[in-house]
Amino acid sequence: MAEITAKMVADLRAATGLGMMECKKALVEAEGNFDKAEEILRIKSGAKAGKLAGRTAAEGVLAYAINGNVGALVEVNCETDFVAKDAGFVEFANFVAKTAAEKKPASVEELSELVEAERKAIIAKLGENMSVRRFQVIDTANQLVAYIHGALATEGVLVEYKGSEDVARKIGMHIVAAKPQCVSEAEVDAETVEKERHIYTEQAIASGKPADIAAKMVEGRIRKFLAEITLNGQAFVMNPDQTVAQFAKENGTEVVSFVRYKVGDGIEKAVVDYAAEVAAAAKV
């Protein structure tokens, strides 16, 4: 039987990023053959990734990449906020964003396939399920800028614009804070407007106001609704005395489009009863 030295284990750990004991076991199984041991670990890490696939990944980070006139914003999920802060996980998320910007995949499934080897490797290292949840690529003749909020990187935006990068970045910060649904009123679908109009009309009728006054009330509330959900109509968070459209115009800038994400939006997180888990473990 080949002797397994500490240096061999350390070298394999450096090459794979896996635990010392896992690397030692692989070297023993491979009878000291480094390449074979690395192959064994790759196979086992794939099995580990499959084993964890059913667990809910509701934490994570956002990452972006801008490659010339192509930009990508991605959300990559893991199971715990502890792993979400891990440098290796963040590096994986950045790799996913870079891959999305370079390859411009057509779907999450296609992007996931492109990064599957790296995903399995980081799962094997950190022991949590991870997944590419969503992404968007903007391929444009215009300019691009991104803003990721805070050290935890859980909210962010990719902005397509014309004009000043500094102004566009400030507007990106506004988008994260104020959460507009679209850039302008023209992008709000008619069905949404009519639904709101119906609600406001019924409320006005119920208030007993005369028809002409009720009609004016409805139109006023529709204007307010559109201002609240559109970027151009919102009061600019850095100067509420002007709208975002006014701030952009006076600084020679126009926002063409944007995509905004918040990690975990719409994912139902599992509620863990740790007391019950400890009690159950104590009976084993």
From Swiss-Prot:
Q: Which Gene3D superfamilies match?
A: 1.10.286.20, DNA helicase RuvA subunit, C-terminal domain, Elongation factor Ts, dimerisation domain
Q: GO CC: one term?
A: cytoplasm
Q: Where in the cell is the protein located?
A: Cytoplasm
For whether the record's keyword set contains Protein biosynthesis, the answer is: yes
The record's CDD domains line, in alphabetical order, gives: UBA_EF-Ts
Q: Which UniProt keywords apply?
A: Cytoplasm, Elongation factor, Protein biosynthesis
Question: What's a single GO MF annotation on this record?
Answer: translation elongation factor activity
Which InterPro entries does its entry note?
Answer: EF-Ts_dimer_sf (IPR036402), Transl_elong_EFTs/EF1B (IPR001816), Transl_elong_EFTs/EF1B_dimer (IPR014039), Transl_elong_Ts_CS (IPR018101), UBA-like_sf (IPR009060)
What family is this protein classified in? Belongs to the EF-Ts family.
The cross-references to NCBIfam families, in alphabetical order and at most eight, read: tsf
| HAMAP family associated with the record | EF_Ts (MF_00050)
Q: What does this protein do?
A: Associates with the EF-Tu.GDP complex and induces the exchange of GDP to GTP. It remains bound to the aminoacyl-tRNA.EF-Tu.GTP complex up to the GTP hydrolysis stage on the ribosome.
Q: What protein name is recorded for this chain?
A: Elongation factor Ts
